Amino acid sequence: MEGTRGHILQLMVMGVLLGMTFPGYGANQTPGYDDTTTPEILNPYWMATIPDIYSVSDVTMPGTHNTMALYGGSLAECNSWSLTSQLRAGIRFLDIRVRHAKGNLTIHHGISYQYAHFGDVLMDVVAFLREYPSETVLMRLKEELSDTRDIYGAVVRYINVYAHWDLLWHSREIPTMGEARGKLIVLQDFTGPDLGIRYNSLDIADDWKVSSLQPEEVAKKWRSVSTHLEAATVGNKNRMFLTYSSGASILAHPNALARLINPRLYEYLTGYDDQSKRFGIVAMDFPGAKLVQTIIGFNY
């Protein structure tokens, strides 16, 4: 979910001041949408059978938008599974937002603190890759409401303390699966020397501003998603494609929109005849385990 930090802040403050209520979590677990804490299906080592010679850009992979946004109410929350549960369910793209203050990197969604810091994220990823060395994890790393300090230096310090330098893929070039196994690929969305692949080098569709849950607004969002997915199937194979199915506004909270978009995405993908198509990364809010599994299935 992109946009100015000030706009996000205004939305969150407005939601509190207006006391607006939206459909709450009801422990919904469907093929496309899940706001429970436990995935229905696990796919912890699905990359193991992908040939080493395949480029990571050839892989169709499920991801989550604002991966760690588990707290803060319905306008801030984008997922209900823990990071470890997401990885075990098959999620391989993480969208991590860090706030840099006084040398610390805490996890935030806008003004909402997520009761975690970047070290927690790194430790979970390290533990997962040690248990499943056939896998790779892509991580968009973005500043959220930071001060003016050097975020690059703080990120490097956290990596050295909570992980290890060799965990990272150290190149702007997209690796093959053989090169990427057991690695964390940082998609760098902040200034400074290279830590990995620059986020803005990807072909990205992130039309996150959905003004309401009215049918025409939801349809507009879905057209953006489906159009970019189709573009990924015929696009440059040497470039990674990233499609966000997520969106939000004061009148369209992430969970409410995901309940409408995710079933469409699931129906669209399950109805696709050609399982060899490359869709790239599909980043979602509250994905259902069967939707995750369906995305994985396009690699076989």
Feature names for model-found ranges:
Residues 3, 19-93, 102-131, 136, ...:
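Long, acidic (Asp/Glu-rich), low-complexity accessory segments flanking structured domains
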Residues 100, 133-147:
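Active-site groove signature of glycoside hydrolases
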Residues 162-274:
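Surface-exposed substrate-engagement region within the catalytic domains
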Residues 1-15:
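Classical eukaryotic N-terminal signal peptides for Sec-dependent ER targeting/secretion
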Residues 72-79, 87, 114, 118, ...:
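Aromatic-acidic/polar surface patches that form glycan- and anion
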Residues 151-156:
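Distinct, well-ordered alpha-helical segments
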Residues 139, 186, 282:
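A residue-level signal for conserved active-site and pocket-lining positions in enzyme catalytic cores
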Residues 97:
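A motif-centric signal for short, conserved binding hotspots located
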